[in-house]
């Protein structure tokens, strides 16, 4: 039987202790041997990112998952800093920047709003695909394959059984990420 590809799960939540949805998603994932869960806020509370360490983690994994809440139509500040510093020219893009070529990017995002608010004419004015376009473009700039994101809408108001169902789907995808959800 083929081994699943190595997955780096970059988790970025500044108030992780208060996020029931993210705890439910992460708990079963921690049991998967081929998945490295890397909590950016736990590792870098001062925002001083060890760029070389992070780049080595990226080199060592084939699938990169970015799990975070949607903050102001983007990601939390530390993840933005991580993206700007770690995905540097000469490493992930630009001349000689091919370290991530052929790897896979998937965003796993929790939101505080219902799905229907992310549409033209809705409260958030744009569909989620448009809001996530900068992440998709970043993946393309790094020569990575974009996998459709997993979005948990209205995360803090979901019933426990609904969150458990999302967690189960997440684990199933992580067990064979290159054959599901491409």
Swiss-Prot record:
Location relative to the cell: Cell inner membrane
Described function: Regulatory subunit of a potassium efflux system that confers protection against electrophiles. Required for full activity of KefB.
Biological processes, Gene Ontology terms: positive regulation of potassium ion transmembrane transport; potassium ion transport
Family: Belongs to the NAD(P)H dehydrogenase (quinone) family. KefG subfamily.
PANTHER family listed in its UniProt record: GLUTATHIONE-REGULATED POTASSIUM-EFFLUX SYSTEM ANCILLARY PROTEIN KEFG
InterPro entries assigned to the protein according to its UniProt record, in alphabetical order: Flavodoxin_fold (IPR003680), Flavoprotein-like_sf (IPR029039), K_H_efflux_KefG (IPR023947), KefG/KefF (IPR046980)
Coiled-coil positions: none
Subunit text: Interacts with KefB.
Encoding gene (name): kefG
GO molecular function: electron transfer activity; FMN binding; NADH:ubiquinone reductase (non-electrogenic) activity; NADPH dehydrogenase (quinone) activity
Mode of membrane association: Peripheral membrane protein
EC number: 1.6.5.2
SUPFAM superfamilies tied to this protein: Flavoproteins
Name recorded for this polypeptide: Glutathione-regulated potassium-efflux system ancillary protein KefG
Organism the protein comes from: Yersinia pseudotuberculosis serotype O:1b (strain IP 31758)
Source organism phylogeny: Bacteria, Pseudomonadati, Pseudomonadota, Gammaproteobacteria, Enterobacterales
Highest taxon, organism lineage: Bacteria
Xref: NCBIfam families: PRK04930.1 (NF003430)
Keywords (A to Z) from UniProt: Cell inner membrane, Cell membrane, Membrane, NAD, Oxidoreductase
Any single Gene Ontology cellular-component annotation: plasma membrane
Catalytic activity: a quinone + NADH + H(+) = a quinol + NAD(+); a quinone + NADPH + H(+) = a quinol + NADP(+)
């Amino acid at each position: 039987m083929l081994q699943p590809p190595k997955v780096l799960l970059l988790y970025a939540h500044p108030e992780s202790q208060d996020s029931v949805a993210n705890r439910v998603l992460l708990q079963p994932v921690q049991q998967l041997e081929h998945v490295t869960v890397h909590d950016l806020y736990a590792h870098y509370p001062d925002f001083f990112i060890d760029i070389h360490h992070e780049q080595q983690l990226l080199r060592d994994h084939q699938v990169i998952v970015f799990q975070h809440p949607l903050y102001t139509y983007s990601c939390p500040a530390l993840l933005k800093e991580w993206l700007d510093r770690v995905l540097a020219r000469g490493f992930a893009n630009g001349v000689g920047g091919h370290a991530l070529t052929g790897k896979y990017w998937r965003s796993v995002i929790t939101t505080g709003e219902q799905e229907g608010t992310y549409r033209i004419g809705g409260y958030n004015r744009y569909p989620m695909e448009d809001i996530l376009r900068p992440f998709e473009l970043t993946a393309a700039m790094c020569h990575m394959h974009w996998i459709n994101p997993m979005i948990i809408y209205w995360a803090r108001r979901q019933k426990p059984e609904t969150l458990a169902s999302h967690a189960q789907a997440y684990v199933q995808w992580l067990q064979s990420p290159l054959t599901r959800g491409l």
